[in-house]
């Protein structure tokens, strides 16, 4: 991972901790908290493991780039991530450990699919999303992410779940949406297989053009450097 400095330079995490320009933008105590753990190195695995969120992303090519390209984050984005994490912790702090941050894993021959359920209390699976603007309806990939977690539960666990809810949290309000219970495991498997094939061939999957393109951090790679792969 590289940190994009306010000066425009790209820094290693350790250097960013003492960078004068980074310190000028974010006070030292906050900066060090933002950078904590950001220099972790990925450990090689025998077979790839994909998060549910990466498989239900609007564009599988973006998920491919997130694996193959070095991650670059600016301080504003780091603050957004950290704020979201803090809100998640606040919401779930009174839940028993067995009802929050529940790790799930589905093994396939060539890959695994993994995820963390934000909360699963009584008969409901909850997925929390922090946002500046609360939508009028749940975004499709957020609904799919929650449904994906439900799909990966053991049959006896699924039988106990009557509701799946996506909860949007802004600094001003909270809004809850219920999404249908449905099994999307075949979709997750197909997307993971496609991503595995693309990674093995070192060729990006087909571009999935949509509204997200103009906000994508990999726009230049996708539409310029790799346009020959369309």
Protein language model features and the residues they cover:
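Metal-dependent nuclease catalytic cores that hydrolyze phosphodiester bonds in DNA/RNA
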Residues: 1-124, 132-134, 138-140
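A residue-level signal for conserved active-site and pocket-lining positions in enzyme catalytic cores
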Residues: 59, 149, 216
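Metal-dependent nuclease catalytic regions and adjoining charged, substrate-binding loops involved
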Residues: 2-27, 109-112, 138-139, 152-230
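A broad detector of the eukaryotic-type serine/threonine protein kinase catalytic domain
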Residues: 130-133, 200
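Acidic active-site catalytic centers that drive phospho-/nucleotidyl reactions
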Residues: 118, 127, 145
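Residue-level recognition of conserved beta-strand positions in structured domain cores
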Residues: 128-130, 168
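Generic alpha-helical hydrophobic packing signal
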Residues: 101-105, 146, 162-163
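Short amphipathic alpha-helical face segments that pack within enzyme cores
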Residues: 86, 90, 144-152
């Amino acid at each position: 991972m590289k940190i994009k400095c306010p000066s425009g330079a790209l820094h290693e995490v350790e250097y960013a901790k003492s960078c004068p320009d980074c310190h000028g933008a974010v006070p030292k105590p906050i900066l060090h908290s933002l950078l904590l753990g950001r220099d972790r190195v990925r450990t090689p695995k025998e077979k790839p493991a994909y998060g549910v969120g990466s498989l239900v992303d609007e564009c599988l090519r973006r998920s491919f780039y997130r694996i193959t390209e070095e991650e670059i984050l600016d301080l504003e984005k780091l603050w957004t991530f950290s704020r979201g994490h803090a809100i998640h912790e606040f919401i779930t702090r009174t839940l028993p450990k067995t009802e929050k941050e529940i790790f799930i894993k589905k093994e396939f021959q060539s890959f695994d699919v993994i995820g963390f359920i934000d909360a699963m209390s009584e008969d409901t699976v909850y997925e929390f999303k922090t946002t500046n603007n609360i939508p009028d309806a749940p975004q499709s990939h957020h609904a799919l992410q929650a449904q994906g977690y439900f799909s990966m539960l053991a049959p006896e666990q699924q039988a106990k779940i009557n509701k799946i809810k996506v909860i949007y949290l802004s600094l001003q309000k909270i809004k809850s949406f219920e999404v249908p219970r449905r099994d999307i495991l075949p979709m997750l498997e197909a997307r993971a297989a496609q991503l595995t094939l693309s990674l093995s061939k070192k060729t990006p999957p087909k571009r999935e053009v949509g509204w997200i393109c103009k906000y994508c951090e990999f726009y230049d790679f996708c539409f310029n450097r790799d346009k020959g792969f369309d």
